[in-house]
Amino acid sequence: MNFIRPRRFAVFSSLVLGFAATAAVHFQRLPAGGMQPQAATDAAHTVHLLWLGGEPKAADVFYQKLPEGRASSDAPLRVNSQPGSAIAIGTIRGAQFALGRQGRVHVVWNGSGGALPKPADSAPLLYSRLDDTGKSFEPQRNLITRTTDLDGGGTLAADTTGNVFVLWHAGTPGTKTTEDKRRVFVTRSGDDGRAFSTETPVTDSSGACGCCGMKALADDDGNVFALFRGARGGVHRETTLLSSRDHGVTFAVSPLQDWETGSCPMSSAALGVSARGMLAAWETKGKIYFRPVAPVAGEAGAPEEVTSGPGAKHPALATNARGETLLVWTEGTGWQRGGDLAWQVFDAAGKPTAERGRKPGVPVWSYAAAFARPDGDFVIVY
């Protein structure tokens, strides 16, 4: 398969001299014991935060709104109706969320060992949404009806017309589930998550990396994008883009970058909307790469290596109103091991600014999220 050759973009001081930082970066800690934050901002500049808390092997999912990114006096809402039905161990199978029509919050997560309801041949993929009052979440539901052996984390996207798309990789009923035979599946809702279709395959049986997560996002035009890691032949673990221009009915499959390894790296990826189009960030060989994947005005280009240290994982993206983008990731995290934050701000043309850094304090089983404030500055949540 053909891949775009990456451009090396190591971020050292000698490379950023002459760039004036415009957006500053601020930091916000999760509540005590919080892990695996997710952040999204709506049209009213309200920041929506999601995170895990409690026991890592039997965690809870929490949600909170921050008006214009400021601290809120409202207590967080627990998303999961069954206590301890989420899982933080592994840093891959936690909760993800999306904002749909009229700002409704949709959440999906891999179920813990005791999570219910449970399908016959798999851990559950659980879903809930904010109810019509906006004050609590509906009882959790399992979305798996026929696939087997859920492993790496599922994902979801939602658009402004009531469509919700939930994707995960799994085995096919009646066949032995090996990594090189796993497929990506999607279930769709056209009524704001009230009901979902039976899952259908998006990819062929050429594989998906078992313990790696996925990331999905819908743009303002209702196009749906998702990232997953393949497992072609059991060794070609390429970061792969799925893109749908027909509201999730069909998906084009585009490999972005190969990684030849016989073992699963337990990686995650990020998507973000910017003036340059849809942006993607992912891990390859312990480094973070970054590029537009649905560019405007014909812009494309090779993946850019942006990391400055070893063991880079778990990227997240945020873009402000000026078109500047913050890319944040972790360094040194691993199994039962926390690590550091690292970040780089890019200008509206995608060039690195002088705003970059590294900071300790990422907890075990965690990573960072980010959002842009109305004044253009960025906040990293960890």
What are the roles of these predicted feature ranges?
Residues 1-5:
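N-terminal secretory signal peptides that target proteins for export/translocation
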Residues 6-8, 278:
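Short helix-onset patch at the extreme N-terminus, typifying the N->h transition
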Residues 10-20:
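Bacterial N-terminal signal peptides
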